[in-house]
Every structure is written in structure tokens, then in C-alpha cells.
């Protein structure tokens, strides 16, 4: 049994090279990771809230949503740490229908996993 390649998928190294995190974003991530770890270890009394849409399938809407969470985070930072949950697939029992951004970044076009990986990376930056 063999596989037929429909399209080549970029490697993680290629994606990271083409779409690296900025120095400022890296610094923010390290700081947030430390805050989260301190909550999990009981060293920080704030609550973690992991929140987000059931499924992220619109890049612009998701970026607007996360920007709103960021504004809210600044208001509740003494009590809460808000963590956006960004789930980019849509579970399907039968395997039929729209499967989410990973498989089909534009719901009105055909599947394109390569473009889906890029769209998801963009959203997570």
C-alpha cells in the first residue's frame, strides 16, 4: 500500500523560519508562562481561566476576540489570568463537512492543509 502526495506540507522548521516570533512576543510568552506556572504551583493566588470559542474558523474575528480578551486582562490582572483557547478544528463524527481551518482555511474554497498551517500559525502569533 502506498500514499499519493497531493501537496507538500511545510515542516515545523520551515514554518518557524518563515513566521518567527518577534523578540517582544518571546519576552511576553516567557513572562506569561512563568505566571501560569506560579499559579499551578500555588505560588500565585490568581485564577486561570482558559476561555475561547468552540471553534476558531475566522482569522479576523478571532484576532478581534483575542484583542478584546487582552483589554479585559488588563482590567482583571490582579485576580485572573485569561488564556485564550484557540481550537482550529471542527470535530466530525462522519468525517464529512467542514473540518476547520487546519484542513480548509477558507470555508468557501477547497481543502488546503499547507495554507491552513500558515493561517493557524498567524493566529497564534
Locate each region found by the language model.
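Catalytic cores of large soluble enzymes that bind and process phosphate-bearing ligands
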Residues: 7, 21-28, 57, 61, ...
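Generic N-terminal targeting/processing segments that precede catalytic cores or assembly contacts
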Residues: 28-46, 61-74
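A generic, well-ordered mixed alpha/beta core segment in the N-terminal half of proteins
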Residues: 67-125
Amino acid at each position: 500500500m502506498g500514499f499519493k502526495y497531493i501537496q507538500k506540507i511545510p515542516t515545523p522548521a520551515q514554518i518557524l523560519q518563515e513566521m518567527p516570533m518577534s523578540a517582544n512576543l518571546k519576552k511576553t510568552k516567557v513572562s506569561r508562562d512563568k505566571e501560569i506556572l506560579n499559579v499551578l504551583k500555588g505560588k500565585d493566588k490568581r485564577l486561570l481561566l482558559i476561555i475561547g470559542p468552540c471553534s476558531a474558523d475566522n482569522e479576523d474575528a478571532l484576532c478581534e476576540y483575542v484583542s478584546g480578551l487582552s483589554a479585559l486582562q488588563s482590567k482583571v490582572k490582579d485576580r485572573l489570568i485569561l488564556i485564550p483557547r484557540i481550537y482550529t478544528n471542527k470535530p466530525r463524527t462522519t468525517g464529512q463537512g467542514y473540518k476547520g481551518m487546519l484542513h480548509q482555511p477558507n470555508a468557501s474554497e477547497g481543502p488546503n492543509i499547507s495554507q491552513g498551517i500558515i493561517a493557524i500559525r498567524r493566529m497564534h502569533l
